[in-house]
């Protein structure tokens, strides 16, 4: 049920931007971007970050899964560190979705909760996920 809801929400977000594809310069637009922040596996490959992606809609990032290095990967793509995606500045990481609670998808959660807060996120992280997600986040904050 949760995965269906998540996939439906993501499809709606992306489909709202469909008219952009009709213009000649849609690739230059930053209205909607799908950014692979990590494509790694549970194995600790040094050249791959853990599984995570960001859907950036009108500059607002929505993270899906938070493998190892998610905050650093996002920040490396922000203008502060030489990237071009303003929405991925650490203080903008405010919406997060977990698909499941395997460690390779969750180990970046403490970094996402705490680092973004220390660098100026002005509201609590909005976290959505399967049963057990709230408990995990609460333990990080203890």
Residue ranges and their predicted role:
Residues 21-142:
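Binuclear metal-dependent hydrolase catalytic cores
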